[in-house]
């Protein structure tokens, strides 16, 4: 049995996550009281009429805070039943969450006559601390639209042909902010920039003209070899520590050329030794 627990601050995309999982064969339960987690696991395993190989539940700030404080204990009870359990935590920056609530005009679960929306959003971080501290996978949805979020969820949660640690190589542009869910970040902005070559500007780091240009630059090759040597040594240690997900982010200014080239090349080089390797280009439209 596989169980995915979806959590995160209100407005971060939990409903979308459940929709994606339901569309891919998961039995989904929204707003499950955390105290019922062990009972749900037991019933799903033992009741032949309720044999559910894939279950997803959302647990968030709508829960009793006393149940949320017990979350580590409840999770341990589930994992003692030899259930594969992943915790997905979605979040976005405060400004983005405020904007989303303003657009939908929905009520935040923590607002009341003494607590404004901005205060509720800030307080929710503390309320969910017992869950976020145990999250296997964190996704920052600040810069993701609905379709990008759905694609990201499919890539990280559903596209895992091999058991063990899933390694995501993600390119990004610093001008849109660093991915807060990255475990390792490498900065490629010091490398020669194809953007300043008019004949290369409209190509991406996945296309041959840019690939040929960057492959011919000694600094690019030197950085690639240095990063590759580091990752070859240390990523197996991440896997040995039973990490479910590791994100390696490579950034350049716009996220179109240098970071894309390096992320793609590194993912190809490490695909065989690491087995479960994925690649995503955050800012490549």
Swiss-Prot record:
Ligand binding (GTP): 60-63
Positions with a binding annotation for ATP: 8-15
Keywords: ATP-binding, GTP-binding, Nucleotide-binding
Family matches, as InterPro entries: P-loop_NTPase, RapZ-like, RapZ-like_N, RapZ_C
Listed GO MF terms: ATP binding; GTP binding
Family of the protein in this entry: Belongs to the RapZ-like family.
Organism listed in the record: Ectopseudomonas mendocina (strain ymp) (Pseudomonas mendocina)
Lineage: Bacteria, Pseudomonadati, Pseudomonadota, Gammaproteobacteria, Pseudomonadales
Function of the protein: Displays ATPase and GTPase activities.
Protein name per Swiss-Prot or TrEMBL: Nucleotide-binding protein Pmen_0867
Signal sequence coordinates: none
